From Swiss-Prot:
The keyword Manganese does not apply. Disulfide bonds: none annotated. Coiled coil: none annotated. Gene3D superfamilies: 3.30.530.20. The keyword NAD does not apply. Laticifer. GO terms for cellular component: cytoplasmic vesicle; vacuole. This is Major latex protein 15. SUPFAM superfamilies: Bet v1-like. Keywords: Cytoplasmic vesicle, Vacuole. InterPro entries: Bet_v_I/MLP (IPR000916), MLP-like (IPR052006), START-like_dom_sf (IPR023393). Signal peptide: none annotated.
Amino acid sequence: MAHQHTISGLVGKLITESEVNCNADKYYQIFKHHEDLPSAIPHIYTSVKAVEGHGTTSGCVKEWCYILEGKPLTVKEKTTYNDETRTINHNGIEGGMMNDYKKFVATLVVKPKANGQGSIVTWIVDYEKINEDSPVPFDYLAFFQQNIEDLNSHLCASD
């Protein structure tokens, strides 16, 4: 597990990255085909649904209900996909987190390991705080790290 952060005033970037045992395509596809996430890791996601467009098409808007530090929260985000690079951008547009951030983009990147055994999963959080009092979203960095670990356990158990 590796963590990086770059913070300059109101703008910052947080990164968490881990190796997983799962196939890169399988890991990427469960996030692209989001309907299975609440049953795979229900302690993290309580529901997710496309509210505009088709959920697997770039430009769709999804509503995610999730648990962060024991609190139920909801966010609407615009999603873009790059199947070639196994990259998904989640651009927050509405919900509780947008009370603290002008911009909140969470990017998932899944790369196969060079030896063909498993993958490297990276979550990148690019954000711009509304003001100096808005927190650096370290809680979301921990949330995405938990996503990596718990989804890996679920997917490997189902192999």
